[in-house]
Amino acid sequence: MNLIEELNLNKEDVVSTKKLSIKGEKKVFDVYRIPLEYLKYNKKNGRIATYISQFIDEGHDFSKDINEFNNIIEKFIEESNPDALRKTKQNIKILSQTEPAVVLSNGIIIDGNRRFTSLRQLSREGAGAEFNYLEAVILDSEKYNDKDIKRLELNLQHGVESRVDYNPIDRLVDIYRDLIENGGVFTPEEYRGETQKTLKEVKKDMEISQLLIDYLDFINRPKKFYIARKQQVDGPLREIYTILKSDKIDQEYKTDIKEYLFTNIMALSGDTTRRIRELKTVFEDRRLSKELLEEVEQDEILDDITDYFNELDVKCDTVELSSELIEKIKSTTEEFVERKKYKNARNQPIELLNKAFKTLNEIDTEALA
């Protein structure tokens, strides 16, 4: 299908224009009003990556009927951020569509999924004929390859509008697929150029994305990203990244440290991110770190957890440790965090005295004479 030909569009149908950067060039494109029934969601949309993977893992197939297909994806768009959709829908209802979307000539939406969703819902609700159309740029699907389209998506996501509503796990999945999986679609340098990030930030995101993959492998749920979304592991993974990047930890035991930290994601309750952060000073104290890992090995905690995950039904969406394992991990973590706090408190008077002596030694006694 070619929308331009199918709808017999010409210059008289142009309602506005939109500037886009594609294939390294900035161009001004015409914007048309397209009937909603000719349009289709993009199931490769990074915003709903975890929902798509869950849908497929559960054994479902996408319908070839465009309306049924769109109904499935619409539900994912709404679930991913209902508040943002509600705001977009309300704005469109009051002001109409103010920002043009971007679609391919085959009808697949590249940018504007939430606007499309809002219009579909308003149209179904009988809000008015004006909501039966999406205003969008139409790009020739034969002219641009997947990399060109992905580059455009990144440019739109990180350009004028700050996309703060992007689920952090879906973002990590997107980074993994764009930069790591099968060699990546982009080099880190190319990605930096499209996202307005520094190369250091891009490489950090890559390492955290890889930690997400490692974590899911550790719990024997490889690439089941929706589990990570449900567990809200973004904060804990970022703390783990900080710990593993510390030059104070013993690099010889880096893998054991990482796996023990992964177990804490599963075992700790409350503010997991903060509680994992507290382990940083423990692992930076090499003596305490060694003692903790020796205790973990002696109690066979990591071995027991590996066996536990291997015995769980891989198809099970809920991943929880047994109460016995949770208690083992919690008590070990709490013991060493408290020991480190006690050690710091005990050393504080000595540190204060050293600072005092240093200050006294720096006093110019001749100036006092």
What is each residue range found by the language model?
Residues R287-A369:
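Charged/polar low-complexity intrinsically disordered segments, enriched in acidic residues
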Residues M1-E130:
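Short, charged/polar connector segments at secondary-structure boundaries
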Residues R115, L172, P188, V233-L237:
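Short runs of predominantly hydrophobic/aromatic residues within well-ordered alpha helices
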Residues A127-L134, T198-G270:
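Amphipathic alpha-helical "recognition" segments
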